[in-house]
């Protein structure tokens, strides 16, 4: 499988057919299409939220274009981030330990918000033949969040000494250098209060997921349910359980497919780390599509090595690129290389390499345009530049 995350704005900027033609040339099998974003706006017609683009049903366009080209279309929803909903329900924002209530992050423990997302997803499934439902931001975003009076009560009900764990978290993030691992070390040595804190956060995330997924399964038993997960949970349970409330083991039982966001450059990591994340994710039991760093900071070489590392793991299901519009793509055809530039910068130079030779080619490929380059050898690597800056490139 080759997946790609896609912002709805891409259709408005480039045109739906051109965008999906580009995906077809890349060999994309699965498109994860942003259907409800961080702003709270939606890419489809619903009474529950305003549209991203007035007068256009971008989800309908995307489903039609994907199916016409034999691709699967997954409706992608940002879960616990919704600026519009928090503006209407300010008391439901996620509460920071020292800074107070967020104006854009929703508390994932709020049943009212879970029901809202359930209803949004139900609207999509009732009106559109999407192939999947994809949940993102299915988490607390940091251990410093989740400290309202209601949150403290939830931790107490789980059996935690809420005052003690709050003080331990404060010590970890605002104490001295020697305290930087205090709460995580407590988890690892089996501190019952810290374990209860983690359990409460995991349960809140799982309850949110269950509310949405049960409705989706009832409406469409054949639907593919997937989630984008933070990468640390594949190998560091203390970190993921406490920070995010994400348990790969438990979420893997709820979803058909998980997408660990193994964005190597964002974490200062290499391709070996991508393989480590993929290997840990595979153990959770769900199908794994590893999310790769294909946006600013990545290059043709880093993406190639990350993809090889992910695909080299036994049991891995494929890769998913973040995101359409941030990298150049190319397809090898008989005697030529077909290059597409969906980015917002001019491509000025390409480097094409095979086993025995490398060619640097001066090229001018404006945003949204294509170019064909004659080929006389087998290509295995593509790199691209915009003036002095190297940009990401994907070679099919």
What is the meaning of each model-derived region?
Residues 15-40, 127-132, 251-257, 310, ...:
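Catalytic domains of carbohydrate-active enzymes, especially glycoside hydrolases
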